[in-house]
């Protein structure tokens, strides 16, 4: 089978590589490249460390973890006066129903830290008059309140104590009324009404309910989050077991590819078709089973969004949609296999060659762990710095008032507030902790530091990935260009390639990752603008933004593709980034047919391998967590949403499979570029023999001439 695969000659894409008798693979004698970018990334890292030090100096993560009282003090923080008071108590939670809550995210009522939430109905008037339960009531008064000679009216006026307390339960470290329903009637404790402690008529419990809802605007979202968190706490070890199974399957698959590449690829293709076929069969059986059942004919549009995915599984339309999607995917895969069957044979040969290369460079299978750990380090540094930056603001106090007040919302000082004229003009006004901010030079530029933190994270993460790619490329290129394998290969190909990359090409890797980081940062800013403009009526702006997002998405994909091939050229020839990118692009364009078909076919086959691993583990997780495996039915944990661990296992399995198959992907890409250069440099003669394996030569109808016997 002859496979020319070249595009017509075009000088615009340069001349084919000429034969060089001295070329034996990755060049050893090379110099430093893109030194300016190397200096830039070093300076960037120094500045990044400086930003981190400043953030860690001024930041305080306690502001995220612990609630704060009206004085800005933390509740439950070890080493503070409130160490034994972990819960936040609202003097009058009904005031949280004020629209100010939605504008300023703070209730216009006094808030203190308490040891326990109240468990009974009491009013200050009743305890002050009878002295019963007074010691219990005092724990809900301001710290230091001991002037028992003050009249109840003065105590309530000065907000020394709450007018009433109600049975409450802690939620997210805050005391909320213990509201429940009995036979559809809203109650708190065992009552539907309560005394507000101000001598007014009995108030309805629904007033408390309204205040509690506004006190926590995201109460329902937090409840869902808490349920998801609970699911993780009872299923985390099963999730880990599922991920271990995915790792074992991926490892077995990669090892089998090493020895049985051709058979494994065809087995993989058949299994993918079989798995999707079973999915279609299962969806049809569920669709047929639900026929005639009450409520199963409700449409997805009518039922709307539900957090419990089990609701959707009782609808026939859900299983019909799944079946249609799987049928479309099945047809697409089968058609691709039919039309690409000839190219698949060449792709299998390339995968076989990649398997041999991995066999000679076995350390390449564990090298992605090094890259993974470095990426995790980048993520950890970015996340910690972001938290410290976001919590490095100072406590800001604002004027809060129940009624209309000209000073409402102004900044105030709680130490001197009672001596100002604000209390004379607005007697009900209070100076309370509002949020964390600041007016200093540092606080004004916090957003700049956050943007720099995000940008440096993208730059360093892309740099680490680039380092991994160029290291693997150098190792696999040394395999391909070794005429006598493994005699002509270095003793430690991975370490040799890593050393060359760090010593000579840090600047080139920084250059490529910088370009990619800039494009990714622009995409993030466009997403932010899109989020801000969602409520806008300007359709022209929305359309323009959508076009920009699409263009930069395509640009990012192209740059990733170009960078990947440029790193291969850097690993082989030691040229700078721009030269390597140009040479790689021209080489690919001179062989555009092979690139468009052969290289993408191998990517498709490797993707099927990932799909097979994810499909096997995903189906197993679905049957286990939905309690459909009789043998281990009692072992499966009881969950609020069983899709939570299933989706986690599926996502984790894909990342694990991607980690293992990425080695093969980089190996295939490297061998592919070497393969193209081999065809351009050599012709199979005794003077210019091919470096490709005998199986590839046979498949392409190429051969090396042997020297005639004398």
UniProtKB/Swiss-Prot annotation:
The chain crosses the membrane at residues 35-55, 237-257, 261-281, 320-340, 369-389, 459-481, 509-529, 568-588, 604-624, 643-663. The lineage of its organism: Eukaryota, Metazoa, Chordata, Craniata, Vertebrata. One of its GO terms (biological process) is ethanolamine transport. This is Choline transporter-like protein 2. Residues 1-34, 258-260, 341-368, 482-508, 589-603, 664-710 are cytoplasmic. Choline/H+ antiporter, mainly in mitochodria. Also acts as a low-affinity ethanolamine/H+ antiporter, regulating the supply of extracellular ethanolamine (Etn) for the CDP-Etn pathway, redistribute intracellular Etn and balance the CDP-Cho and CDP-Etn arms of the Kennedy pathway. Residues 56-236, 282-319, 390-458, 530-567, 625-642 are extracellular. It is found in: Cell membrane; Mitochondrion outer membrane. Belongs to the CTL (choline transporter-like) family. GO terms for molecular function: antiporter activity; choline transmembrane transporter activity; ethanolamine transmembrane transporter activity; transmembrane transporter activity. It catalyses: choline(out) + n H(+)(in) = choline(in) + n H(+)(out); ethanolamine(out) + n H(+)(in) = ethanolamine(in) + n H(+)(out). It comes from Xenopus laevis. It comes from the Eukaryota. Glycans are attached at residues 147, 190, 204, 401, 418, 421. Keywords: Antiport, Cell membrane, Glycoprotein, Membrane, Mitochondrion, Mitochondrion outer membrane, Phosphoprotein, Transmembrane, Transmembrane helix, Transport. One of its GO terms (cellular component) is mitochondrial outer membrane. It is a multi-pass membrane protein.
């Amino acid at each position: 089978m002859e496979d020319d695969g070249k595009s017509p000659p075009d000088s615009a894409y340069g001349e084919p590589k000429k034969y060089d008798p001295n070329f034996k693979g990755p060049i050893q004698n090379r110099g430093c490249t893109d030194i300016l970018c190397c200096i830039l990334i070093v300076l960037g890292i120094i500045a990044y460390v400086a930003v981190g030090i400043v953030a860690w100096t001024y930041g305080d993560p306690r502001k995220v973890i612990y609630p704060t009282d009206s004085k800005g003090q933390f509740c439950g923080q070890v080493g503070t006066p409130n160490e034994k008071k972990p819960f936040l108590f609202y003097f009058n939670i009904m005031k949280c129903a004020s629209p100010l809550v939605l504008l300023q995210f703070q209730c216009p009522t006094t808030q203190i830290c308490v040891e326990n939430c109240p468990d009974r109905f009491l009013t200050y008037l009743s305890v002050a008059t009878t002295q019963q339960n007074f010691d219990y009531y005092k724990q809900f008064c301001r710290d230091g309140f001991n002037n028992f000679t003050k009249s109840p009216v003065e105590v309530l006026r000065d907000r020394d104590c709450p007018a009433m307390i109600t049975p409450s339960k802690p939620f997210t470290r805050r005391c909320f009324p213990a509201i429940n329903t009995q036979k559809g009637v809203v109650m708190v404790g065992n009552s539907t009404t309560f005394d507000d402690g101000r001598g007014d008529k009995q108030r309805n419990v629904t007033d408390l309910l309204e205040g509690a809802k506004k006190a926590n605007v995201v109460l329902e979202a937090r409840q869902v989050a808490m349920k998801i968190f609970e699911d993780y706490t009872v299923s985390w070890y099963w999730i880990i077991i599922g991920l271990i199974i995915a790792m074992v399957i991926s490892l077995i698959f990669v090892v089998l590819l090493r020895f049985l590449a051709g058979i494994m690829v065809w087995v993989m293709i058949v299994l993918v078709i079989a798995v999707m076929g079973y999915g279609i069969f299962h969806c049809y059986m569920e669709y047929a089973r639900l026929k005639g059942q009450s409520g199963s004919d409700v449409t997805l549009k009518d039922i709307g969004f539900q957090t419990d995915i089990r609701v959707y599984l009782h609808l026939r339309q859900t299983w019909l949609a799944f079946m249609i999607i799987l049928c479309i995917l099945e047809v697409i895969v089968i058609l691709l296999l039919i039309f690409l069957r000839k190219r698949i044979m060449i792709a299998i040969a390339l995968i076989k060659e990649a398997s041999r290369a991995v066999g000679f460079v076995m350390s390449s299978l564990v090298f992605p762990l090094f890259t993974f750990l470095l990426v995790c380090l980048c993520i950890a540094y970015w996340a910690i710095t972001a938290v410290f930056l976001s919590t490095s603001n100072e406590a800001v106090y604002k004027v809060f008032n129940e009624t209309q007040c000209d000073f409402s919302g102004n900044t105030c000082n709680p130490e001197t507030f009672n001596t100002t004229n604000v209390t004379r003009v607005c007697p009900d006004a209070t100076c309370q902790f509002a949020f964390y901010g600041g007016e200093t030079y540092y606080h004004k530029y916090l957003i700049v530091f956050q943007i720099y933190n995000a940008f440096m994270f993208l730059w360093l993460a892309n740099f680490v990935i680039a380092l991994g790619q160029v290291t693997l490329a150098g190792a696999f290129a040394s395999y391909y260009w070794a005429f006598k394998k493994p005699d002509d290969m270095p003793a430690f190909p991975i370490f040799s390639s890593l050393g060359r990359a760090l010593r000579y090409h840090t600047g080139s890797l920084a250059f490529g990752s910088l370009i990619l980081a800039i494009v990714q940062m622009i995409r993030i800013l466009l997403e932010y603008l899109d989020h801000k403009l969602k409520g806008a009526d300007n359709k022209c702006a929305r359309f323009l933004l959508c076009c920009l997002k699409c263009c930069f998405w395509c640009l990012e994909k192209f740059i990733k593709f170009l960078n990947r091939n440029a790193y291969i050229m850097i690993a082989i020839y030691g040229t700078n980034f721009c030269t390597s990118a140009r040479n790689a692009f021209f080489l690919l364009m001179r062989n555009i047919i092979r690139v468009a078909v052969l290289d993408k076919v191998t990517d498709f086959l490797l993707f099927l391998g990932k799909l097979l691993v994810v499909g096997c583990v995903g189906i197993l997780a679905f049957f286990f967590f939905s309690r459909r495996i009789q043998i281990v039915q009692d072992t499966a944990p009881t969950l609020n949403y069983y899709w939570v661990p299933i989706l986690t296992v599926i996502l984790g399995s894909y990342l694990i499979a991607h980690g293992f198959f990425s080695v093969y992907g980089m190996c295939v890409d490297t061998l592919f570029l070497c393969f193209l250069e081999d065809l351009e440099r050599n012709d199979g003669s005794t003077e210019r023999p091919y470096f490709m394996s005998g199986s590839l030569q046979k498949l392409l109808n190429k051969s090396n001439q042997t020297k005639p016997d004398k």
